[in-house]
Amino acid sequence: MLNSEFLEFPETTARVATLDNGLEVIVKEDHSAPVVSLQAWCRAGSIHEGGWLGAGMSHFLEHMLFKGTERRNANEIAQAVQAEGGYINAYTSFDRTVYWIDTPSAGFENCLDVLCDVVAFARLPEDEFASEADVIRREIAMGDDNPEQVLSKALFRTAYTIHPCRYPVIGFLDLFNQLGRDDLYGYYLEKYSPDNLFVVVAGDVDADETIERIESHLGGISRRRRPSVVLPEEPRHIGIREESVPFSTELVRGRLGWPIPPGDHPDGPALDILAAILGNGKSSRLYREVRENQQLVNSVGAYSYAPTFQGQFVLSYDTEPGSSKSADEAILGEIDKVKSDGVALDEVNKVVRQALSSQFSTLTDMRGQASDLGSNWITTRNLNYTRDYVKDLQRVELEDVVRVADQYLADDRFTRVSLVPEA
């Protein structure tokens, strides 16, 4: 153990109940404030779209679920939540779609009714389909003008050769334009079967009553047949893959990415520590050496992206056009220094303290608690996963950080993508 001040978060008091139709309910009572966060998680994201890969179907469906149910139109959905002082929103990623409402506890019952209605009884009205499709087309166009989004898409399509995360969550315009309302509704019926959903509630509620209420709303929905989606395993990365994208920019924006294991792998904590030592903040090695000392970049950072599938260890930077080669070499040189010279105890302990503080902050509000439980469940089916992660983070030894740098950050096996000024 590196740090004698070993801290441990107590196990969650959240409960899990499974209804007869397979829908799972997770409830965490917290009466510290009269607030509730309720979330519906669907195990369907852009990587699960099968024959429609690249069309952005999951994201489009997220938009359309707010457009009307059997009992409410779009305005009535929004007004019902606002009347309780609540806020409703949603997001879609590679492997999930999440709908959430934050509300004062006095409005919990009505907001729960709205959330269940939206997720389980959506109509996807034809008269809303065309207008919402136009909204998403504008989103796609905005993304094509956003350098960070363009660079991220370039990284994923280059780093992955067969895994469906190489397609953007929002989809490609030409494939998106082929979607019809019936295609979307068929996908909805398939993916939003109760056994592919779970509901998380955290806050000022009674757990038994909450489970009963959710069962009254959703327990009568029958499971629907869902074809299994087998995700291809990304083959071993061989060599250096490169892509350079001309873009309307004065700077060169670069990213270097190395394949790393999924988020539940035992090496995850050591990789997170390595990323923070290299590129998290002004005290990081890359900032001090490559930006301040050598003045080769305008900005630089690092992060470890470890989802439910093979992830990426990413180093990013912005630099002047004439400095990109030198910046690349200097950044790779800092990795070599970790491999040859190791890391310091105070560097590791600083990262651990920051992670503990971040986790504590996450658990101080209801949405943070609900999101933590939901993410843990969809990733590992262990509600205490992040608590276990914090324990593991504090057990990382100096040699573990060097080992993962040696094992995963090979100098002849990574992806390099960049945005360069248009000629």
Segments the model singles out, each with a brief description of its role:
Residues 1-3, 240, 413:
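Polar low-complexity intrinsically disordered regions
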Residues 1-35:
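N- or domain-start disorder-to-order transition segments that initiate the globular core
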Residues 39-41, 226-283:
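His/Glu-based metal-binding/catalytic segments typifying zinc-dependent metallopeptidases
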Residues 22, 30-81, 256, 266-278, ...:
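Active/ligand-binding-proximal structured segments within catalytic/core domains
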Residues 285-293:
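Short amphipathic alpha-helix segments
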Residues 12-13, 18, 26-29, 74-228, ...:
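Charge-rich, well-structured scaffold segments of protease-associated domains
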